[in-house]
Amino acid sequence: METQGVMKEIQYEEFEEKIIEIRRTSKVTKGGKNLSFRVVAIVGNKNGKVGLGIGKAREVPEAIRKAISAAKRNIIEVPVINGTIPHEIIGRQDASKVLLRPAAPGTGIIAGGTVRAVVELAGIQNILTKSLGSTNPLNLALATMNGLKNLLDPRKVAKLRDISVEEVFKGVRREDNA
């Protein structure tokens, strides 16, 4: 069992980490205010894997450690084709919406701070994004992750439709003679 734990740690070493937000929160009690911190962190290998985590603790370093640990447990696979996403999609989380559009090579990452961090760590180099609604960093990050998670892999779509990957991108339809 120990070797599995070691393998998982080695697997995580390749991930880059970014802190999206550190928020101080307070709980008002009869004895006064209890301060704590909430940290939102993103981890990714810049090669199609990205994760988001939230950590809460009385001290900032402990909250950061918890957030990064949670992000490593919540990693998703993102289909990246030629440095961009395969199709347009809208990610939603509460009052936040994020429009993600594929872009031509050389466009770069057109995105705000929170969305940019998620997209960069996913390994996407060319993308157009637009944040709509609430700009709360946590909800924007969750909406972006939702959009990336719901992207369809062209290879899987081609297999389901029994056509080639090129035909998926061209939008060619086969006429059935049945």
UniProtKB/Swiss-Prot annotation:
Key words of the record: Ribonucleoprotein, Ribosomal protein, RNA-binding, rRNA-binding
GO cellular component terms attached to this protein's record: small ribosomal subunit
Annotated GO biological process: translation
Entry-linked Gene3D superfamilies: 3.30.160.20, 3.30.230.10
Domains as described in the record: The N-terminal domain interacts with the head of the 30S subunit; the C-terminal domain interacts with the body and contacts protein S4. The interaction surface between S4 and S5 is involved in control of translational fidelity.
Family indicated by similarity: Belongs to the universal ribosomal protein uS5 family.
Protein name: Small ribosomal subunit protein uS5
Gene label: rpsE
